[in-house]
């Protein structure tokens, strides 16, 4: 079976490996090299690096909307196109090119969390489970019928990065299962998504990373987890802007103004919130690296309870 794979970030690499394990991946589509690092030199995507290492031809069009790019895809004569976090819109004409259409690996239990950031939004919302769907793509945003799915519990300690890695591996397994069925001549049953329960996972914005102490401590703790490793939550701590890599919510009544330092010890720095308190465990000062609360307190001798 001739497969064209389209993906860009690290999340898609496991799925590319799964597709290449028992099938012929005739080409990989990925976004053009982008500026990265302090030198802003052009850097290849993780998917491109994996494809090159495997000797798979790589295509990097800026868009798939023009006829030349679509003809290039037709010339590959794909039986199936697998799309995993590609980042470019696939026009209807492209969806119709492969014999079996286009499959997408999506990191949520559709129709919940359609869109760009399903992993982080699930944590932020306090969901107790998520999963992966293998979807038959259509013109709408993540609206296609689901072929296979697999659930995954969300641990109360999961960060965005940790859940990302778990779902990347789960996505590869679900894709492998689907490809195995197709190879055996069995096309998975396409089940339309329910009309109820649709939510959208909008793209992350750095502005969202600024914590407002007026909010509930539980919600703030979930934001800290969801936004690690990017964009990393930040807040004002006794007059200093800090980034917060690790924190837990405390269910306690305090009667203090939001943002007040309630306690400070090696275990963490407790900050009054609109409801409860947030214990900061891992912080980062401007221009510095992530450090424990104990190390932060050693560096900030001026920090006082009640500030």
From Swiss-Prot:
Binding-site residues for (6S)-5,6,7,8-tetrahydrofolate, renumbered to this chain = 108-111
Keywords, ordered alphabetically: Protein biosynthesis, Transferase
Q: What class of enzyme is it?
A: transferase
What does the sequence similarity comment in the record state about its family? Belongs to the Fmt family.
Q: Name one Pfam family in it.
A: Formyl_trans_N
A cellular component term (GO) from this record? cytosol
Q: What is its EC number?
A: 2.1.2.9
Q: Could you tell me what reaction this enzyme catalyses?
A: L-methionyl-tRNA(fMet) + (6R)-10-formyltetrahydrofolate = N-formyl-L-methionyl-tRNA(fMet) + (6S)-5,6,7,8-tetrahydrofolate + H(+)
HAMAP family, alphabetized? Formyl_trans
Q: What is this protein called?
A: Methionyl-tRNA formyltransferase
The entry's function note states:
Attaches a formyl group to the free amino group of methionyl-tRNA(fMet). The formyl group appears to play a dual role in the initiator identity of N-formylmethionyl-tRNA by promoting its recognition by IF2 and preventing the misappropriation of this tRNA by the elongation apparatus.
Q: Which InterPro entries match?
A: Fmt, Formyl_trans_C, Formyl_trans_C_sf, Formyl_transf_N, Formyl_transf_N_sf, Formyl_transferase-like_C_sf, GART_AS, Met-tRNA-FMT_C
Q: Does the entry annotate any disulfide bonds, and if so which pairs?
A: none
Which SUPFAM superfamilies has this protein been placed in?
FMT C-terminal domain-like (SSF50486), Formyltransferase (SSF53328)
Q: Name one GO molecular function term.
A: methionyl-tRNA formyltransferase activity
């Amino acid at each position: 079976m001739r497969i064209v794979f389209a993906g860009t970030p690290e999340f898609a690499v496991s799925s590319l490996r799964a597709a290449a394990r028992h099938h012929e991946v005739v080409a990989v589509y990925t976004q053009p090299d982008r500026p990265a690092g302090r030198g802003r030199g052009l850097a290849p995507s993780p998917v491109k690096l994996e494809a090159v290492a495997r000797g798979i031809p790589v295509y990097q069009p800026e868009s798939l909307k023009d006829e030349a790019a679509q003809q290039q895809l037709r010339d590959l004569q794909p039986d199936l196109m697998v799309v995993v976090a590609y980042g470019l819109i696939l026009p209807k004409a492209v969806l119709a090119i492969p014999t079996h259409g286009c499959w997408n690996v999506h990191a949520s239990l559709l129709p919940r969390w359609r869109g760009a950031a399903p992993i982080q939004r699930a944590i932020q919302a306090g969901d107790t489970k998520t999963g992966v769907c293998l979807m038959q793509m259509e013109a709408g945003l993540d609206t296609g019928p689901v072929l296979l799915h697999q659930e995954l519990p969300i641990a109360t300690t999961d960060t965005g990065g940790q859940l990302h890695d778990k779902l990347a591996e789960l996505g590869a397994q679900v894709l492998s299962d689907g490809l195995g069925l197709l190879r055996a001549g069995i096309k998975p049953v396409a089940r339309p998504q329910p009309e109820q329960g649709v939510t959208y996972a909008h793209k992350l914005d750095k502005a969202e990373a600024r914590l407002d102490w007026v909010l509930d401590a539980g919600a703030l703790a979930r934001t800290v987890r969801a936004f690690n490793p990017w964009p990393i939550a930040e807040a004002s701590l006794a007059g200093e802007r800090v980034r917060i890599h690790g924190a837990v919510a405390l269910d306690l009544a305090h009667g203090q103004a939001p943002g007040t330092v309630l306690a400070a010890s090696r275990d963490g720095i407790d900050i009054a919130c609109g409801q409860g308190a947030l214990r900061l465990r891992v912080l980062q000062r401007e221009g510095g690296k992530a450090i424990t609360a104990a190390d932060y307190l050693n560096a900030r001798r001026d920090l006082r309870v009640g500030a």
